[in-house]
């Protein structure tokens, strides 16, 4: 930010910076250090015009001295502080920022996922009615999710200088929908692969932007919606720590599987998070203010599915429309899976299901599945039996049109037969 750049090729400069990092760990016992604007150090031409920088010995724009410095810093720091984290705020596609130095990486433990943050906040700031046009911003992050060890970050940078607090990024005018949308955003963030960083004040929905010259607006915790969001975040953190499926395989493709990432019109995503021991959680998230009942969704395996978390619970400020009964899957294809269940998806909501053993569920807890047409398509999302019932309600006392049509055809055939018989007789 207009400051001088260190000469990373000189031992005096490297020694000063490394000693500074070690001081924070030794004297202040910090849990970790974040390196700000790493890209400005890695590139010789960062923020410079043509003629203002000199290429490296290979003719490129990479700052080779800075690369060597990062490797030395991370190696020395980790040798003395094995449990302390080193995090890079790196906004470009520089390869191997995280990982083992022996493999050629810079040696950081984690990298801020700036791509996810920009895409996700852009998506969430859009009116829910138009989010389907930005649906790709929701799903794109999984294409590169395993290229680095990422942290999903909503930092101080996103809630200052006119960018609005998180609650005010939500576009709804209605206060209840605004908080519901924010709960959904955090629910998606916590179930998406990657570690989490959420800046202070955003956990209880502070309306004002953060300002370094004053404290947080703690008085807002006396308001109902802020209190309930605060409780939601507390319970979400408890759930996160309790469920290894949400964090154990963040950087392994085995830990995540899409169920449906193509429902742009409905703005719904569903996916599975998986633990090392094979335990699975089914996550369904809706980003529109539409209540969807009897919504058909494919499941990874047949059996019983119990809802263990729902952002729409009344204690969190929701309407209380939940999946209170255990869902039993049916052999009915959906989302390219042979088994499926019907669930209720709350408006602007996130729900999590666990596959449970039949022996652990009582008969009273189970929702008796309806007999449905196994050829039903995803777009219908309503059992055929239900459609027939609805049709009968709409037309009480009327004769079915198809039956009426068949009757007319039979009468016409009968008349033609009579004419032919009469001609033969004559």
Mark where each language-model region is.
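Substrate-binding/active-site clefts of carbohydrate-active enzymes
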Residues: 1-62, 343
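Short, flexible active-site loop motifs that bind/organize anionic cofactors or intermediates
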Residues: 3, 172, 338
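Residue-level preference for long, well-ordered alpha-helices that form the structural scaffold
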Residues: 10-13, 17, 58, 62-66, ...
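Conserved alpha/beta catalytic core and glycan-binding cleft of carbohydrate-active enzymes
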Residues: 29-31, 46-212, 241-312, 319-320
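Carbohydrate-interacting/catalytic domains
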Residues: 175-179, 188-198, 202-396, 401, ...
């Amino acid at each position: 930010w207009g400051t001088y750049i260190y000469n990373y090729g000189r031992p005096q400069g490297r020694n000063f910076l490394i000693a500074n990092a070690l001081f924070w760990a030794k004297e202040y016992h910090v849990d970790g250090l974040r390196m700000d604007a790493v890209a400005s150090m890695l590139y010789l031409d960062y923020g410079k015009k043509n003629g203002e920088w000199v290429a490296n010995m290979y003719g490129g724009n990479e700052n080779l001295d800075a690369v060597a410095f990062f490797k030395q810093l991370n190696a020395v720091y980790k040798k003395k502080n094995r449990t302390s984290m080193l995090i890079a705020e790196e906004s470009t596609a520089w390869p191997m920022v995280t990982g083992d130095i022996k493999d050629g990486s810079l040696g950081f433990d984690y990298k801020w996922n700036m791509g996810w943050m920009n895409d996700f906040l852009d998506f969430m700031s859009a009116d829910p009615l138009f989010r389907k046009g930005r649906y790709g911003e929701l799903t794109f992050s999984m294409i590169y999710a395993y290229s680095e060890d990422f942290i999903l970050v909503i930092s101080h940078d996103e809630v200052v200088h006119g960018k609005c607090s998180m609650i005010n990024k939500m576009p709804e005018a209605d206060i209840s929908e605004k908080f519901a949308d924010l709960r959904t955003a955090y629910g998606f963030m916590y179930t998406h692969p990657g570690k989490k960083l959420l800046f202070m004040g955003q956990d209880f929905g502070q309306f004002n932007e953060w300002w370094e010259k004053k404290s947080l607006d703690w008085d807002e915790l006396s308001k109902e919606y802020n209190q309930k969001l605060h409780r939601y975040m507390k319970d979400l953190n408890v759930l996160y720590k309790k469920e290894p499926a949400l964090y154990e395989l963040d950087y392994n493709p085995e830990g995540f599987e899409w169920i449906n990432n193509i429902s742009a019109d409905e703005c719904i995503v569903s996916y599975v998070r998986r633990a090392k021991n094979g335990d699975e959680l089914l996550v369904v998230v809706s980003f529109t203010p539409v209540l969807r009942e009897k919504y058909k969704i494919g499941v990874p395996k047949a059996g019983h599915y119990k809802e263990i978390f729902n952002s729409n619970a009344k204690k969190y400020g929701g309407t209380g429309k939940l999946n209170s009964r255990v869902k039993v899957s049916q052999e009915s294809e959906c989302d390219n899976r042979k088994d499926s269940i019907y669930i209720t998806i709350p408006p602007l909501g996130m729900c999590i299901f666990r596959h449970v053993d039949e022996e652990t569920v009582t008969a009273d807890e189970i929702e008796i599945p309806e007999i449905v047409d196994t050829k039903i398509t995803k777009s219908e999302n309503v059992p055929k039996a239900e459609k027939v019932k609805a049709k009968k309600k709409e037309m009480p006392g009327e004769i079915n049109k198809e039956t009426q049509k068949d009757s007319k055809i039979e009468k016409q055939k009968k008349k033609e037969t009579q004419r032919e018989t009469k001609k033969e007789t004559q």
